[in-house]
């Protein structure tokens, strides 16, 4: 079995010859985006670039962002969220598998009434963490202040997107809260749980 991203035949409109493109490239052309790993600066920049390009290409055609992510870096995650709010097309978010930490933040950032979780998906929220354990005291204090600002931002956005009171979200984020698809719907992170269809 070959290793790597599968290739599929694709013909651009007006082009007489089909060419082999990787499956993700083909799906992007249908406005289907994937967040399928931990959020990093590189991944964030790629998704942001795709959202901007597809928005410029057709600002009325909706985008679909499939989320299966354990989370990742906070600032790149916020950058994805902000871009989702900035671009003209509505962005549907669909949780397939796991949307944890910043993954759930991005899931909640989809267009209201267009956020979906598959029936067996899992969603997890918690407060942001810092990796600066070996810093000097002054740096550690500055890092703690910045972390508190980020926590405030995340809590405020979750409260706005879910309709929950700020204090409820603040308390819930103090520990890892795992939810089923129906629990995530009740919490307000998603609007619907997908039903199985054939």
From Swiss-Prot:
Gene Ontology biological-process annotations: protein quality control for misfolded or incompletely synthesized proteins
Protein's cellular compartments: Plastid, Chloroplast stroma
Keyword Glycosyltransferase: no
InterPro entries tied to this protein: ClpP, ClpP/crotonase-like_dom_sf, ClpP/TepA, ClpP_Ser_AS
Residue numbers annotated as active site: 101, 126
Keywords: Chloroplast, Hydrolase, Plastid, Protease, Serine protease
Catalysed reaction, written as an equation: Hydrolysis of proteins to small peptides in the presence of ATP and magnesium. alpha-casein is the usual test substrate. In the absence of ATP, only oligopeptides shorter than five residues are hydrolyzed (such as succinyl-Leu-Tyr-|-NHMec, and Leu-Tyr-Leu-|-Tyr-Trp, in which cleavage of the -Tyr-|-Leu- and -Tyr-|-Trp bonds also occurs)
UniProt function note: Cleaves peptides in various proteins in a process that requires ATP hydrolysis. Has a chymotrypsin-like activity. Plays a major role in the degradation of misfolded proteins.
Family annotation (PANTHER family): ATP-DEPENDENT CLP PROTEASE PROTEOLYTIC SUBUNIT, CHLOROPLASTIC ATP-DEPENDENT CLP PROTEASE PROTEOLYTIC SUBUNIT 1
Protein name per UniProt: ATP-dependent Clp protease proteolytic subunit
Organism encoding this protein: Solanum tuberosum (Potato)
Gene: clpP
